[in-house]
Each structure stands twice: as C-alpha cells, then as structure tokens.
A protein has these predicted regions:
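Membrane-proximal interfacial segments on either side of biological membranes
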Residues: 1-24, 36-144, 149, 155-160, ...
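A structural feature that tracks compact, well-ordered secondary-structure segments
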Residues: 27-29, 41-43, 165
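Glycine-centered tight beta-turn/hairpin loop motif at sheet-sheet or coil-to-beta transitions
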Residues: 35, 169-171
Length: 234
C-alpha cells in the first residue's frame, strides 16, 4: 500500500491510533520512506496543540533535502502544531544530501541519538531544548571531503551549546565548539582548531583565501549574529 500527500510518499504505512476529546494516542506508526524505515509512537494533545513522540527511529534513509528547505525551516508550523517534543530519537545508517549548487553537502552513514528534544515552540522550528549526538562515516561539505564528522549539542531556553564538532580531513583533524543564543539576533560564538590540515581548507566554506599554502595548524575564533528571519548562507 502507498500513501501520498504532496511530496510525502509512504510505502506500507501501519498506523494504530485512538481518538478522544483530549487528542490522539498514536500507539504505533511505521512505514517505509525514502528507501528506509521510520517508526514512532506518542500523543497529540488538543489542549496546547502539542505533539509528543515517545520514541522515534529512522534507519536506512536515502533523503535529498527539498531545494527550499531553508525557507521551510523558517516558516511557521500549521495551527494544529504549536509544539513538537521528542522524548527519544535514534538514527542509523542514513544518507542525507543537499544539492544546493552554492554549497552542496552530504552525510553518509549518519547515526545519532537524542533525548527530550523540543523542535517546535510557538509554531517556530528550532532546537529549543534537549540533547543530541550525531556522527557519520563520511561527509562532503562544498566539495571538501571529511571522515568521521561528529556533533554533540545541548539546548535550553537561552542557548544552544555545541560541545563537540569535529571531523578528520585528508591528513589532519578539525575540532570546534560553538554557542548560539535563542534570541531573535542569534548571537553566535565559534572556536575552531585545526591540526595538520590544509591551511586554506576553510576557503571552500566561505573564508577569504590566505596568502600561504601547504599544511599546518590553524586557530579561528569568531563571533557574530545569525538573524532568525534570514536564510542560512555559506
């Protein structure tokens, strides 16, 4: 069996749900989607328009992001979804691709887990609370190949803290930490260190070209603002 809604195309979906005046109890949802499997359960509460997923798992996905995914991320959610909470989530062996010609990227064999994540608040997408860890076997960011990229973050009502952001390059390693405020100005601070890496590796990611070549150690500390109402750019 198939289910098609707009660009959403599910194969062999199984849904077990109970409806009541208080909302919907989703006992089971499983489906094949984009070459992989998705599974979840939880509740939608009419009071507060809150969707709480007790457990969500995604495995074997081969997914290309929509061309306008950055704009979609900025749009408000439908009236029935004021808040989205994930008590637990896991990801295994997923392939995620962005074909944006200005900054294409790909994550191969993406695994991850998280807990108590709030992804929608007041109809706005974001990472508003909780923790997540993600890692992949390999990745490409604007035609720069890296190995074993990993990320660890925690979020609360005031700040998203990235305590680990690292990847191996062809010869060396890049390591970074960062913080982003939850205010509309999105005040951002990043500290990056590279050991034994091409000194111009950041050029492909939007940094000005340096008048030197070869491998070496680099250190970068930067602060700025990522406006909440502006799309992300490299």
């Amino acid at each position: 069996s198939e289910f098609i809604y707009g660009s959403l195309h599910l194969f062999d979906p199984i849904i077990n749900a109970e409806f009541s005046p208080q909302g919907v109890a989703l006992r089971q949802f499983t489906s094949r989607w984009e070459g992989g499997m998705v599974r979840t359960s939880g509740n939608w509460l009419r009071d507060g328009k809150t969707l709480i997923l007790d457990d969500a798992a995604i495995a074997g996905l081969e997914y290309t992001l929509p061309k306008n995914w950055q704009q979609l991320w900025m749009e408000t959610t439908p009236g029935w979804l004021n808040s989205l909470q994930l008590k637990r989530f896991s990801a295994s062996r997923n392939l995620i691709i962005d074909i944006d010609p200005d900054f294409p990227w790909q994550l191969t064999a993406l695994d991850g887990y998280g807990a108590n994540l709030t992804l929608v608040t007041d109809h706005k997408w974001g990472v508003w609370s909780g923790s997540a860890n993600l890692n992949a076997a390999a990745a490409t960011f604007n035609r720069v190949d890296v190995r074993r990229p990993s990320l660890a973050l925690t979020a609360n009502s005031s700040t998203v803290n990235i305590s680990e952001l690292s990847a191996f390059t062809e010869k060396g390693i890049l390591e970074a930490t960062a913080s982003v405020s939850q205010t509309p100005q999105r005040q951002t601070h990043i500290s990056l260190n590279g050991r034994g890496v091409p000194v111009n590796i950041l050029q492909q990611w939007g940094w000005p070209e340096l008048p030197i070549t070869g491998d070496g150690n680099i250190q970068l500390v930067a602060s700025g603002a990522i406006q909440a109402n502006a799309t992300l750019k490299p």
